[in-house]
């Protein structure tokens, strides 16, 4: 993999991780032990490996079966997902969040990683390198979740919704780039 191929994946990993970062900011404002913070971040990272992997496998299958139609659908999926993230971030009401424990942690991690499934689907259609991609997504999401949790412990409402909006805009940009390569 060349440096030029790695840069878009790194940017996309940060875009996907912004959702985990934003939610972790709010969660970090609760009383959490360091061990809980580490465990939450690792769980989010693992889900950001599993979900895009499943998406990439499915995306490769669709690409082999449907070719150009699958490429177009992958780009549209990224654009739609990006707009959805921006839209839902703007309309989201500030609700009280509780620290996820046990099964609720898995549900939480699944929720913040569901967008990585869609991105994985698109990347699978385009034939991205699986191992590098999913490890990068997992590591960056884990790191951003930890950063969000630690910042949330010390500050209130620094980025919140704005972090999700930036992530959504980046996904729209990548979708447009796939539709109209420069």
UniProtKB/Swiss-Prot annotation:
Q: Which Pfam families match?
A: Mntp
Q: Where in the cell is it found?
A: Cell membrane
One of the entry's Gene Ontology molecular-function terms is: manganese ion transmembrane transporter activity
Q: Which UniProt keywords apply?
A: Cell membrane, Ion transport, Manganese, Membrane, Transmembrane, Transmembrane helix, Transport
Coarse class of the primary localization is: membrane
Can you tell which superkingdom this protein's organism belongs to? Answer: Bacteria
Please list every transmembrane segment annotated in the UniProt record, as residue ranges. Answer: 6-26, 37-57, 71-91, 101-121, 131-151, 162-182
User: Does the keyword section mention Membrane?
Assistant: yes
Is Transmembrane included in the keywords of this UniProt record? yes
Q: How does it sit in the membrane?
A: Multi-pass membrane protein
Instruction: Tell me which PANTHER family the record gives.
Output: MANGANESE EFFLUX PUMP MNTP-RELATED (PTHR35529:SF1)
HAMAP family the record matches: MntP_pump (MF_01521)
Function text:
Probably functions as a manganese efflux pump.
What protein name does the entry list? Putative manganese efflux pump MntP
Protein's organism: Bacillus cereus (strain ATCC 10987 / NRS 248)
